[in-house]
């Protein structure tokens, strides 16, 4: 026998079946065997460019996404490698699981990071530090106006204002002049023509580099030799000095002042710290005004916890990636104070290539727990797996410490009652006090 593999669902790819059959990992085989037909259809979907999975808590969406990655790697194994996949996730569930699966299937681990970390790295030349999302949320709890500012700065209206500002910079940011190199001269009028006509499609702050390269090419042709680096760089800098500034922090501050918003403190790079509410507006301006290195090596992007991404973040992702995507999450599990239905605005961002799939049936929790949670957040379309348990006990208390001690005594009358328990409090300060 070459390989043995049992499955309740049909998987067409012979190599994937062979690899699973050769592998003795019980965890992988058990999950594959129990995948339902509708989940298998999601895993093997290769037609839709943008696949959005709205899955209730405990519906198996993460498991489906994991197996979808494995299936795609083997379905398109000639063109898609693990290095061509990027996972944007705030937690390590993907990397922890995939680190066991992919080596067994002959693949290296896939790159995974949070989108916040990705953004912070992109802004290292703009600010020395960026505020964490959790700090932003805690500030919103203390200050309702902070929540209003954050919502505003992630909105389409704010993006439209930044777009208008970017168009105005086309003229306001520029101070054109002649540029000379030895006996060669590029006149102001020639530079303006190149800048606004020939290279109009290049982002504003990268456009002058193209003008400079044109002049350098002309010089090298006439001299019949390449200019050495020590001569090229000062020449390019002459062109870049025609910008009033190329500092995105300064430009964003200029935008805030123009539109009547509270401005950021004027500080040198090494002392700048961006509030979380400003991180993605600055990043958007950076991608709007300058040419960034293309991530052409990424052929499939996986976005986890889709409900925690703002409209602005998705607009940035669209600018950064032109590849296929698997986007998954649950609008009921957002970290925001109020639910935002990303499924309402995603089609407007990604267009007709987007297909939406809903996984409503929850398998993880008992009917009592799932029903309580659904009522708490106003979810009405959840389908429950008929597994019953103890009812949820809800109590109002005035002494949190005493209530916690009582709960511990109730949950843990002996060491064998539960393996784990969680105490959820509204902020870090309360958690530290209880610990």
Mark where each language-model region is.
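Pre-Walker A adenine-sensing motif
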Residues: 33-45
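Hydrophobic anchor at the beta1->P-loop junction of P-loop NTPases
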Residues: 53-55
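Conserved lysine of the Walker
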Residues: 61-62
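Walker A (P-loop) phosphate-binding loop of P-loop NTPases
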Residues: 58
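N-terminal accessory nucleic-acid engagement/regulatory domains that precede
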Residues: 1-18
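Pre-Walker A (Motif I) flank of P-loop NTPase domains
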Residues: 47-51
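Conserved helicase motor core of SF1/SF2 NTP-dependent helicases
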Residues: 78-79, 83, 92-108, 113-120, ...
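Alpha-helical nucleic-acid-binding subdomain
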Residues: 73-301, 307-316, 332
């Amino acid at each position: 026998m070459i390989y043995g593999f049992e499955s309740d669902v049909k998987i067409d790819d012979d190599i994937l079946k062979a690899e699973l059959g050769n592998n003795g990992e019980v965890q992988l085989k058990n999950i594959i065997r129990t995948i339902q037909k509708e989940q298998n259809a999601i895993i093997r979907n290769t037609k839709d460019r943008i696949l959005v999975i709205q899955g209730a808590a405990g519906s198996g969406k993460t498991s489906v996404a994991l197996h979808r990655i494995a299936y795609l790697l083997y379905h398109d194994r000639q063109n898609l490698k693990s290095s061509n996949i990027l996972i944007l996730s705030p937690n390590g569930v993907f990397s922890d699981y995939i680190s066991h699966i992919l080596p067994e299937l002959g693949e290296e681990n896939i790159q995974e990071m949070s989108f916040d970390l990705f953004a912070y790295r992109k802004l290292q030349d703009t600010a020395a530090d960026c505020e964490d999302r959790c700090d932003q949320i805690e500030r919103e709890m203390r200050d309702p106006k902070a929540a209003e500012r954050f919502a505003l700065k992630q909105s389409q209206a704010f993006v439209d204002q930044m777009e208008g500002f970017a168009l105005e910079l086309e003229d306001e940011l520029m101070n054109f002049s002649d540029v000379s190199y030895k006996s060669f001269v590029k006149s102001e009028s020639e530079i303006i023509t190149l800048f606004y006509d020939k290279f109009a499609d290049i982002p504003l702050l990268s456009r002058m580099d193209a003008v400079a390269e044109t002049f350098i090419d002309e010089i090298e042709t006439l001299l019949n030799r390449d200019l050495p680096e020590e001569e090229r760089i000062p020449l390019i800098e002459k062109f870049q000095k025609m910008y009033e500034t190329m500092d995105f922090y300064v430009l964003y501050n200029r935008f805030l002042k123009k539109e009547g918003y509270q401005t950021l403190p004027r500080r040198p790079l090494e002392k700048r710290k961006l509030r979380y509410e400003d991180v993605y507006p600055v990043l958007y301006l950076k991608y709007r005004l300058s040419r960034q290195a293309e991530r052409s090596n990424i052929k499939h992007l996986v976005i986890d916890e889709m409900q925690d991404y703002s409209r602005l973040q998705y607009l940035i992702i669209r600018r950064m990636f032109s590849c296929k995507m698997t986007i998954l999450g649950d609008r009921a599990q957002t970290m925001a104070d109020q639910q935002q239905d990303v499924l309402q605005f995603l089609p407007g961002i990604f267009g007709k290539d987007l297909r939406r799939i809903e996984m409503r049936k929850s398998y993880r929790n008992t009917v009592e727990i799932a029903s309580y949670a659904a009522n708490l957040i106003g979810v009405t379309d959840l389908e429950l797996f008929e597994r019953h348990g103890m009812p949820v006990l809800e109590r109002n208390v005035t002494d949190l410490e005493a209530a916690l001690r009582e709960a511990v005594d109730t949950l843990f009358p002996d060491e064998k009652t539960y393996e784990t328990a969680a105490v959820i409090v509204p902020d870090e300060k309360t958690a530290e006090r209880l610990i």
